[in-house]
Design a protein with these regions (language model features):
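Hydrophobic, well-ordered secondary-structure segments
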Residues: 42, 115-116, 132-136
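General "foldedness" signal
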Residues: 22-24, 109, 118-120, 132, ...
Length: 172
């Protein structure tokens, strides 16, 4: 059986500075920050019944489409019958401590808000439910306060339907 990786993406209710301070207080350092513009294209007529992962796999993502070569890719996709479905801009802040194999990502996503994303390769061999619980427990050890029954926000499904959509796994 193929292992499936869980990534949690939890919507946050306080401001960015609050969580930056929490992470710093708990020994993490900001190691990266950027602004990213992604445009997604698909040939799908509808995403009804699709999971976050299925939507992402059915799309072609062009990252930072301002570059000349990406403008040509976009023209070709449109000629091949693809349609633009999502146009997202996010600010990304990555945090890590020396002993972490992965990064905690704080993202401000246009039309969604502030979200924390996290996965951990140490948990990949566990069941989906166990991975999720371990990830939330670990996030809580860094100053967050999530309940293990709380669902994460699905970015693409939320953008698709124009309302917040939640599930147990935000791995796209």
């Amino acid at each position: 059986m193929e292992n499936f990786v869980v990534e949690v993406g939890m919507k946050l209710d306080k401001n960015l500075n609050y969580y930056k301070k929490q992470l710093k207080r708990n020994g993490l350092k900001q190691i990266f920050k950027c602004t990213t513009h992604d445009i997604y294209f698909t040939k799908e007529k509808s995403f009804d019944g699709f999971s976050e992962n299925q939507i992402k796999k059915s799309c072609i993502r062009i990252r930072n489409p301002q570059k000349k070569e990406d403008k040509l890719k976009i023209e070709n996709l449109l000629k091949e019958g693809y349609r633009k479905v999502f146009d997202t801009i996010k600010k990304d802040y990555h945090y890590q401590s020396k002993d972490m194999k992965s990064r905690i990502q704080l993202q401000i996503i246009k039309k969604i808000g502030l979200v924390v994303y996290y996965d951990n390769p140490d948990y990949y061999n566990f069941s989906l439910d166990k991975q999720r619980k371990l990830l939330l427990k670990e996030l809580n050890s860094y100053g967050f306060s999530f309940n293990t029954n709380e669902l994460g926000i699905d970015k693409l499904r939320t953008l698709c339907y124009g309302k917040e959509m939640f599930s147990k796994n935000q791995n796209g």
